[in-house]
Amino acid sequence: MQRRHFLKNAAAALAALGLPALPPWALAAKAVGLRRLGQPQPFDYAWLKGQARALAKAPYKSHKQVLPGPLESLNWDQYQSIRYRQDHALWADGNGKFQAKFFHLGLYFHTPVHIYDIVDGKAQQLAYDPAAFDYGRSGLGGKQLPKDLGFAGFRLNTRKDTDRDFSAFLGASYFRAVGKEGQYGQSARGLAIDTGTGGPEEFPDFIAYYLEQPADDSDTVVVYGLLDSPSVSGAYRFAITNGEVLVMDIDSALYPRKAIERLGIGPCTSMYQTGENDRRMDWDWRPEIHDTDGLAMWTGGGEWIWRPLCNPPHLRFNMFVDENPRGFGLLQRDRNFDHYQDDGVFYEKRPCLWVEPKSGWGKGSVQLVEIPTVDETFDNIVAFWNPQAKPQPGQELLMGYRLYWGAHPPASSPLAHCMATRTGLGGIVGQKRSHFSWRFAVDFAGGELAALAKDPKAKVEAVLQVSRGTTEIVSARPLHELKGYRAMFDLVPPDEGTQQIDIRLFLRANGKPLTETWLYQWTPPPASERKIY
C-alpha cells in the first residue's frame, strides 16, 4: 500500500476522533441493551495468543470487504454525521466509571472489526445494530444494511463525561489517547512493517477487539486485540488507565508468517510541517504547525538525547543504535499558544507519547522516518524500535511496554533540556558576508544552568561536532529570560553537494555535561541557491 494515500486519509479521520456531543434528540434517557451473537465463550490472553498463532500458520486472507453501495459512496461530511447513540453505549447500564461506543464502517474504513464484550471471563460478540446509530446527514437512515456488517473501531468515555472520548481505536492498527488536556494529536500503532524502506509499507489490521467489563471501582479498562497482516499475526493486551497522564500497559505476542525486513515496535506517528527550526514549508499564516517538535531518547547507557524534527525536502531515515533502551518518544515541548495561533486545533495542547520498555529489548535501534509534506493533513513523522535480529517465521516475539500520553513524559533528565532550536542565515550583522553559512541558535534551560547564568565566573562551553563542513562563531552565553543558556554557531557547508550534515552539541562546564545531547541533521542547499544577500 502507498503510505501517503493511506495516511492522508487516516490522519484526517483520526483528527476528528474527539467528537462533540450528540444533539439532545439523538439521546435516550435510559440505556438500551446491546444485541449479542452466539453464546459466551471462555476467554483469556493465552487463548488469544493461540488464535494469533493459528492465523500465522495459515495463508493470509485479506480482511477488507466491499461495503454496500451507500457506505462506499459516503463523503467526509456524511460519514462525520454518523454518531453512535449514548443510550446504546457498552456498559451504560452498569455502575462502572467507563463506557464504550463504536465507529461505523464507511469512507476510508472498509475492514470490519469484530468486537466482543468480556464479562466474568467469558467473551460474547456484539452485533451490529442500525438502531445504535444516528445517521445524521449521511442518507443511510432507513436503508437496509447487513446485520453482520460489523464495526470500524471503538472509543472510550468516562461516565462523568460521555461527550468526549479519552481513547479511540480506528483504522488498521491505529489508536490514540489524551491526557488531561483532552486534545488528540499523534497516534500510536500496534505494529509498523517496512516503514521508510522506500518500498510499499504494510499496515496490519486489528481484526477483533475484546473489551473487558471493568469492576465498578476500577480506574483501568482492559482491551485485547487480534492483529493480522500478510507478514505477521499478533495478540495484544492493553490495560488503559485514564488520568492526568493516560497510561497504556501493553503486552504483545507476535507470530511472523515470513521474514520481515523492518519491524517497528511501539510506533509513534505524528505530523511536522513547519516550526522554529525548519521553515521550508512556512507559507501558512500560522507561525508553527506540528503535533510534536522532537524525538527524545533515554538510551540504555543513560544518555539523554533530543533530536528536533524536520520537514525534509526528501525522505529522511535515521537510526539510533542502542541496547536495552530505557525509553523514547515524540514530544511536543513547545506549549505556547502564541507560537501556533490556532484556536481550532490547539497544537500547544497536543500530547507527548513516551514509550517505556517493561524489560530488556536487547540490541536494536530507535528509528526515525521524516517524510516531506506540504500540509498538516499528512502524518509524515514515524518513530519506533527496530530489533537488530530480523523476525523469522515460526518465532514467537513477546514485547511488553508502556505508553504515556500527556503534556510531559514520565521520565526526564536531571540535566538541562533543549527549549528551542532556531536557524537562519549566518554571518555577522553589519559586515559583508564573503561566504555562505547557516546559523543555529539552541536554547537550553533547567538543571544547573539557572545558577550558572548568575555566576560571572562560570565557564560554560559548547561542545560541538559536525560530520562535514566547518563551524565558526561558536558561543554559549546566559539567556536570562529562560534562566538558561543559548548556544550559537555558524555551519559552513562544503563547496559542493547537498549531502546531509549530522550535528552533535551539548554544554559543558569543568569537564561535566550540563545538558542533554542535541542532535540535528541539516541538508545544505545546492551551491546555486546559497544566497548571502
Curated annotation (Swiss-Prot):
InterPro entries: Gal_mutarotase_sf_dom (IPR011013), GH-type_carb-bd (IPR014718), Glucan_biosyn_MdoD (IPR023724), Glucan_biosyn_MdoG/MdoD (IPR014438), Glucan_biosyn_MdoG_C (IPR007444), Ig-like_fold (IPR013783), Ig_E-set (IPR014756), TAT_signal (IPR006311). GO terms for cellular component: outer membrane-bounded periplasmic space. One of its GO terms (biological process) is beta-glucan biosynthetic process. Its main location: periplasm. Residues 1-28 form the signal peptide. SUPFAM superfamilies: E set domains, Galactose mutarotase-like. The keyword Signal applies. It comes from the Bacteria. GO terms for molecular function: carbohydrate binding; catalytic activity. Pathway: Glycan metabolism; osmoregulated periplasmic glucan (OPG) biosynthesis. It is found in: Periplasm. Predicted to be exported by the Tat system. The position of the signal peptide cleavage has not been experimentally proven. Keywords: Periplasm, Signal. Probably involved in the control of the structural glucose backbone of osmoregulated periplasmic glucans (OPGs). Belongs to the OpgD/OpgG family. This is Glucans biosynthesis protein D. It comes from Xanthomonas campestris pv. campestris (strain B100).
